[in-house]
């Protein structure tokens, strides 16, 4: 959380390399109460670790290797984390839920979904090269994840805290190539279709 950098600015000697990972727990205690702090901090730390692999804007179907199973592994990491974040969200007192959605649940869900989308695109292209019909199923998964991305952003903008953060999640991030890209909307990556007459 940004409070780490504020604390570092206030007292640089108070924050060492060893303190960085534990800094999230007091922050989460302040946001979600004593009972939920440790688990929220664990999820937040993992979210930051996974997000450090690559930014959402720079990710594409070639970011990880599909043939070696690397894509599946990193996508599964996020799926597990999303399940854990959702499980905790459902146990929170109602007064903590908006903050949890903003700070933890949305970032985890959005990145998990993006990983699922690009994994599906990678699998689609990999299987299409072999003229395998499963390529078409993976194309559909990619389309569904692309749609879910927009629904997650709409929910963030309009549902959290009654729409308090409206407009925060409107930046385009799928199809981004450079900081000054000017495109009107997120773009679904190109998908391949294996025609029925080519199916082996």
Language model features by range: what are they?
Residues 1-200:
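Substrate-binding groove of N-acetylhexosamine-processing glycoside hydrolases
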